[in-house]
Amino acid sequence: MTSTLQKNRAGAAFPFDNSYAGLPARFFAAQTPTAVAEPWLIKLNEPLAVELGLDVETLRRDGAAIFSGNLVPEGAEPLAMAYAGHQFGGFSPQLGDGRAILLGEVVDRSGRRYDIQLKGAGPTPFSRRGDGRAAIGPVLREYIISEAMFALGIPATRALAAVTTGEPVYREEVLPGAVFTRVAASHIRVGTFQFFAARGDTDGVRALADYVIDRHYPDLKDADNPYLSLYSAVSERQAALIARWLHVGFIHGVMNTDNMTVSGETIDFGPCAFMDNYDPATVFSSIDQHGRYAYANQPGIGQWNLARLGETLLPLIDEEPDGAVDKANAVIRAYGERFQAHWLAGMRGKIGLAGEEDGDLELVQALLSLMQAQGADFTLTFRRLSDLAGDAAAETAFAASFREPEACGPWLAQWRERLSRDPQTAAERATAMCRVNPAFIPRNHRVEQAIEAAVENGDFTLFEALLTVLAKPYEDQPGFAAYMEPPKPSERVLATFCGT
């Protein structure tokens, strides 16, 4: 009787309204999470739970059991999604959720549909000899980065909860196990389309495309060519998203086609990192040995991934193969222009320009070249430039960003000359710049310090402090000024790891 009551209470916490589970059986494998020994709730994202219309009181009480997979709420239809993918350029026809289980979907108070997924919830038919589990480090990393991206205003999956399992996981060393609860607009990837296309399953591609249009792009239902319009819309969202990554120095680290969503959200934060000193060739991921997914390569990789999506949609775009290729190629060519427009618009904002002039690109590129040559910190340089825009006395602090402070003089002269023709007042400009140039990002060394304290000592104090700081990245927080600072040489993170 007790377990039934608990299940009923848990069910009330999630007003599930599942749709993906209604797709044909070949789209997924039904899979119940595997129970764990002693779950403990590390963190519940209560504001997000409220936004999703969840019962926070129930989640506080039963969250450890629910978010570990020990207690499956009523209305859930747990499943592992099928997908394929190009990983570092090589195609794998079957990947799928090897350690993630989709519990179901909820519709928030604004009518938006979201997936609720457990990562590290045990093996699935797609586990490929893996244990289906996650270690606490990658779980905390994803929690931190997800919420930081949200606060920065960058479309990304969200963190609803993190729990420890009371069980070890075995990687290069024995680590505490954990489960992460992810919220996403959906978990449909470029690789999901590839899964069906690789099998010659055009009906599957069509069913998936129809589902994506209905869920993410309903305004395309009545388009003359809805599948071509879908391809164009996904391309537009990815161009805008990747431009936003570059604006904050974000390096995803593993831009495989199975890690690119069709919703336009950033997903899968395993080896991701934020750049310290500006260098377009920056790579952190330990598995990216040739720099395929380096900072500056991300726009081109986005285009490459979208070309793979286009290949899957060709039979739907036009029955005549040559016509389909021509139409898809036009979308791919347009991606480059779209990305450049989004990137330049954002960079204009970062240096305080409200209007547009032909020389703006050269002015931006000159600053970036100077930053690279002078070893300037990406985030701090732009934040100090924001201060300088409103207070000429801040020039000393800005110049200190460069190895040779006097080196910034010629660029500052060009910048000020350009500002003289811009319509904003100094105060307006400084305010606008502070809204796009964060003071706080998830500094890699700070993330690692928080993870290390949790793994080695079970201490989540640094984790909580980091979440507090990163919730307001564009605000001055005098009590946390140290979190703005770049790492000391001894603190630098040189490589990040996927964690799987």
UniProtKB/Swiss-Prot annotation:
Its EC number is 2.7.7.-, 2.7.7.108. ATP binds at G96, G98, R99, K119, D131, G132, R182, R189, D268. It comes from Rhizobium leguminosarum bv. trifolii (strain WSM2304). Pfam families: SelO (PF02696). Mg(2+) binds at N259, D268. This is Protein nucleotidyltransferase YdiU. The active site is at D258 (proton acceptor). The keyword Manganese applies. The keyword Nucleotide-binding applies. It comes from the Bacteria. Belongs to the SELO family. Signal peptide: none annotated. Transmembrane segments: none annotated. It is an enzyme of class 2 (transferase).
